[in-house]
């Protein structure tokens, strides 16, 4: 075994040992750690390696301005040395080390600001793994150790040893053992039931899980017994007596056992995100992705970038090939991005790092600005994190847009994560426009290919102001809908929205590129072709109706009257008119809340549209519109204000239908009388156009 594993067993007669009491809060914390059962004990190694990494960061920083600081040891590394015989695990670093004052203050007599906060968090049910966020990670050593010895050497002081069995006190003495040069050695004397942390496999597993991206080499020292072959020449010494062979014995090579120390670097996967993206191959990204996620498939897309300026961070984001089966489960952690601060892993479930709709993104974010001991509460308030989040979302959307340029790959992406895009449209108002460009739908004209809203807009008819859609359960179901059939007759394309989340999506997505999204199954459907006719009819009817709209409900009738949500029904209007003490002002207001719905598929309405478009000043249109309106009133259960005028219009239509000329002197007196009472028909010189209505 290397010299570092030798614990200090030298005589201590001449060494002065000082004993100190732990500060009250630290003693409480240690008692809590020792006497409470925690299943997640393995985090002790992460914390000690993280501390070593911090110490190495400090000496490296000092050496930038004063290279002589590294004269006491140029190599910056961390060694892990398990010793099964002594039941010790030693963590050695060549970091900045501690002076005697540092030892006394940092490891026992001065409580960190986070000590009390962490104890409160623990008692409230927080996980022990959060210990490092409160700056007291060192004490996690007592999760597995009954005694801890810390030997340290700082450039400005002698070599000292700190030791405690957590009995409320610790000792500090000058260390006369093997000179370290510079750095710190933490020797854990493990509890009898914690020897699993001496196993090579277990140590490798923990380092891979928690510390594989530490910026300094972590080397594991393992003693291996090897069978060493001994040649015949070596085996026989010059003085050996001649060997007498046993009769019948096989010729066998002599073997002897030899104990060797294997050194294996555990974190060869260097922080790939710190390298220049141009120097990294797809294979390297693939290996890193698999080591990060344990996914058996390669990633679908990757985005590697860094942000510099007032804020500095690097990020590496991956899109997996398939969505996890529990993507939208409530109990699932909110994201899969690991947060590092200066190469030290902080957490992998920081909800503030990325919005929920992007929770399928895997990767790492490494910030230079966040403090290492940041807590969840601090993260929630952190302005730095808000800026990081905004940048991550922006880069994710860029990545999806780039992916959309490759139809095949985007199809795979959309099959897996379309729900996330739609959830984003519902939740993320700031990026709604960009997200809407990523949507893909089947339409009544696209066949088996999904198209974007932009594609739909390029195929829109001239003067079409709306994007028409229908929601339903399956493509076949909505394709066979009567609503879709009507629009297809008019040459209009309808988008098929067949996922439940589409309903929530379109609640927020009101328009795309200035075109309003309109459901073909809801009231208020406007066909551009009939917009002009509806406007003309409203102008003619003035206050008689609140609005004129294209109907979704009519099949055989040319038009009908419906009341608005707040207007009176036909029956209610009849009842109110019969009231002796009625309020006439209310009558006029409530009675006016009628909607005239026209059937775009009816020949009367189509011919009327053509008539109005052929000559906007055709006065016969006015009579036809009023006649249609009054007839619709009757068929919808309402009464007429002036039945006689309506009757006169009907008689006039009958005359036209029979081909009777108004100027014919042989016309009967009754007809003449009717004609006198009736207002002159506007535009009656063109009887042929009136006949087109039939």
UniProtKB/Swiss-Prot annotation:
Belongs to the heat shock protein 90 family. Residues 691-694 are annotated as: Essential for interaction with SGTA and TTC1. Homodimer. Identified in NR3C1/GCR steroid receptor-chaperone complexes formed at least by NR3C1, HSP90AA1 and a variety of proteins containing TPR repeats such as FKBP4, FKBP5, PPID, PPP5C or STIP1. Forms a complex containing HSP90AA1, TSC1 and TSC2; TSC1 is required to recruit TCS2 to the complex. The closed form interacts (via the middle domain and TPR repeat-binding motif) with co-chaperone TSC1 (via C-terminus). Interacts with TOM34. Interacts with TERT; the interaction, together with PTGES3, is required for correct assembly and stabilization of the TERT holoenzyme complex. It comes from Oryctolagus cuniculus. This is Heat shock protein HSP 90-alpha. The modification N6-acetyllysine is found at residues 58, 84, 419, 434, 465, 547. Residues 9-236, 258-578 are annotated as: Interaction with NR3C1. Residues 644-694 are annotated as: Required for homodimerization. It catalyses: ATP + H2O = ADP + phosphate + H(+). In the resting state, through the dimerization of its C-terminal domain, HSP90 forms a homodimer which is defined as the open conformation. Upon ATP-binding, the N-terminal domain undergoes significant conformational changes and comes in contact to form an active closed conformation. After HSP90 finishes its chaperoning tasks of assisting the proper folding, stabilization and activation of client proteins under the active state, ATP molecule is hydrolyzed to ADP which then dissociates from HSP90 and directs the protein back to the resting state. The TPR repeat-binding motif mediates interaction with TPR repeat-containing proteins like the co-chaperone STUB1. Residues 261-694 are annotated as: Interaction with FLCN and FNIP1. The modification Phosphoserine is found at residues 231, 249, 429, 452, 603. Pfam families: HATPase_c_3 (PF13589), HSP90 (PF00183).
């Amino acid at each position: 075994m290397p010299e570092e594993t030798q614990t200090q067993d030298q005589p201590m007669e001449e060494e002065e040992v000082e004993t100190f009491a732990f500060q009250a809060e630290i003693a409480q914390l240690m008692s809590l750690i020792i006497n409470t059962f925690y299943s997640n004990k393995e985090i002790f190694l992460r914390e000690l390696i993280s501390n070593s990494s911090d110490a190495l960061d400090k000496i490296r920083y000092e050496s930038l301005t004063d290279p002589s600081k590294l004269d006491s040891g140029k190599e910056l590394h961390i060694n892990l040395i398990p010793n099964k015989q002594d039941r010790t695990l030693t963590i050695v670093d060549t970091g900045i080390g501690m002076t005697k004052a540092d030892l006394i203050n940092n490891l026992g007599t001065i409580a960190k600001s986070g000590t009390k906060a962490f104890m409160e968090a623990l008692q409230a049910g927080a996980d022990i793994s959060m210990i490092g966020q409160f700056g007291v990670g060192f004490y996690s050593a007592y999760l597995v150790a009954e005694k801890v010895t810390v030997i340290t050497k700082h450039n400005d002081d002698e070599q000292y040893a700190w030791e405690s069995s957590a009995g409320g006190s610790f000792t500090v003495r000058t260390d006369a053992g093997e000179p370290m040069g510079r750095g710190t050695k933490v020797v854990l004397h493990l509890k009898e039931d914690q020897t699993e942390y001496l196993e090579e496999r277990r140590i490798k597993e923990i380092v891979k899980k928690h510390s594989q991206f530490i910026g300094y080499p972590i080397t594991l020292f393992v003693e291996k017994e090897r069978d060493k072959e001994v040649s015949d020449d070596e085996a026989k010494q010059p003085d050996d007596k001649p060997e007498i062979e046993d009769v019948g014995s096989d010729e066998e090579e002599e073997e002897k056992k030899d104990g060797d120390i294997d050194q294996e670097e555990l974190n060869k996967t260097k922080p790939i995100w710190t390298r220049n993206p141009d120097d990294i191959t797809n294979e390297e990204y693939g290996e890193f992705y698999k080591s990060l996620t344990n996914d058996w498939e390669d990633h679908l897309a990757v985005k590697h970038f860094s942000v510099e300026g007032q804020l500095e961070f690097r990020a590496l984001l991956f899109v997996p090939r398939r969505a996890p089966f529990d993507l939208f489960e409530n109990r699932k952690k909110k994201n899969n991005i690991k947060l590092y601060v200066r190469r030290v892993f902080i957490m992998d479930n920081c909800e503030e790092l990325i919005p929920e709709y992007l929770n399928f993104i895997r990767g790492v974010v490494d910030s230079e600005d966040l403090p290492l001991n940041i807590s969840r509460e601090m993260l929630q308030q952190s302005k730095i994190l808000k800026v990081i989040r905004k940048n991550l979302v922006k880069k994710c959307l860029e990545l999806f847009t780039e992916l959309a340029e490759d139809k095949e790959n985007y199809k795979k992406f959309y099959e897996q994560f379309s729900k996330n895009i739609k959830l984003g449209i519902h939740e993320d108002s700031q990026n709604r426009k960009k997200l809407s460009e990523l949507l893909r739908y089947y339409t009544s004209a696209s066949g088996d290919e999904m198209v974007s809203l932009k594609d739909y807009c390029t195929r829109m008819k001239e003067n079409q102001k709306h994007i028409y859609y229908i929601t339903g359960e399956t493509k076949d179901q909505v394709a066979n809908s009567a609503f879709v059939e009507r629009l297809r007759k008019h040459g209009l394309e309808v988008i098929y929205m067949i996922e439940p989340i589409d309903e929530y999506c379109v609640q927020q997505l009101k328009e795309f590129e200035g075109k309003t999204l309109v459901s073909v199954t809801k009231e208020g459907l406007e066909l551009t072709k009939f917009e002009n006719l509806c406007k003309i009819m409203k102008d003619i009817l003035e206050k008689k109706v609140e609005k004129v709209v294209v109907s979704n409900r009519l099949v055989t009738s040319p038009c009908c009257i419906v009341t608005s949500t707040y207007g009176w029904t036909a029956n209610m209007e009849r009842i109110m008119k019969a009231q002796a003490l009625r309020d006439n002002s209310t009558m006029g207001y409530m009675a006016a809340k009628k909607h005239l719905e026209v059937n775009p598929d009816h020949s009367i309405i189509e011919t009327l549209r053509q008539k109005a478009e052929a000559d906007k000043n055709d006065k016969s249109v006015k009579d036809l519109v009023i006649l249609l309106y009054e007839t619709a009133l009757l068929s919808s259960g309402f009464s007429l204000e002036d039945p006689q005028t309506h009757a006169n219009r009907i008689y006039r239509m009958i005359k036209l239908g029979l081909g009777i000329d108004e100027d014919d002197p042989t016309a009967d007196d009754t007809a003449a009388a009717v004609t006198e009472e009736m207002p002159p028909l506007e535009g009656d010189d063109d009887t042929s156009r009136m006949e087109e209505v039939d």
